[in-house]
């Protein structure tokens, strides 16, 4: 299978990063699976979150938690950024952007719940970690035939 591994972005945001580097071995395997049109939405979401975590690690982030649940909802990924800021990362994976950009699915209501869940995560005794700040990021993945677009928006809200 020939695959276009150029990762591009179609959204603009101050501080946003887009991957244009060729993927490393583990990410390359996930690229093929992300482009598999037979994946069910839940499978696509789980694979997208794994891809996002690996992508962020490749960019210097350290995983602190994954799929952490509170009464306000789930935090997809909690990471320590290279500048020692704790980043709560909401991942949105789609097959198309025909119905809008994936980040548009992070509504004001969702943002409020993510903030509340983030506060709860920080208050957990096991999560007392030296850090310089906190932010909420959105990382979007659009996977369509042969191409995966990754767009990371630090401090999205």
Residue positions per predicted region:
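Intrinsically disordered, low-complexity charged/polar segments
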Residues: 1-24
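Catalytic cores of nucleic-acid endonucleases
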Residues: 9, 32-33, 93-144
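Acidic-basic catalytic patches of nuclease active cores, encompassing PD-(D/E)XK
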Residues: 19, 23-66
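Residues at secondary-structure transition points
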Residues: 39, 43, 47, 72, ...
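Conserved catalytic cores of phosphodiester-cleaving nucleases, focusing on short active-site segments
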Residues: 56, 75-79, 83-97, 114
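Short acidic/glycine-enriched loop/turn segments that link adjacent beta-strands
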Residues: 71-74, 146
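Protein kinase-like catalytic core scaffold
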Residues: 73, 85-87, 135-137, 151
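Short, low-complexity, polybasic intrinsically disordered segments
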Residues: 140-157
């Amino acid at each position: 299978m020939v695959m276009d591994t150029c990762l591009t972005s179609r959204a603009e945001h101050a501080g946003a990063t887009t991957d244009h580097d060729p993927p490393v071995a583990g990410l390359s395997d996930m690229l093929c699976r992300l482009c598999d049109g037979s994946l069910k939405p839940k499978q696509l979401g789980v694979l997208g979150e794994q891809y996002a975590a690996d992508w962020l690690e490749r960019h210097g982030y350290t995983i602190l938690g994954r799929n952490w649940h509170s009464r306000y909802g789930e935090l997809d990924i909690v990471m320590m950024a290279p500048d020692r800021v704790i980043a709560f990362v909401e991942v949105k994976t789609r097959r198309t952007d025909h119905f809008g950009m994936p980040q548009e699915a992070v509504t004001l209501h969702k943002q409020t719940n993510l903030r509340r869940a983030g506060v709860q995560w920080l208050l957990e005794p096991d999560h007392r970690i030296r850090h310089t700040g906190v932010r909420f990021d959105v990382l979007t993945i659009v996977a369509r035939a042969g191409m995966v677009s990754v767009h990371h928006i630090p401090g999205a809200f």
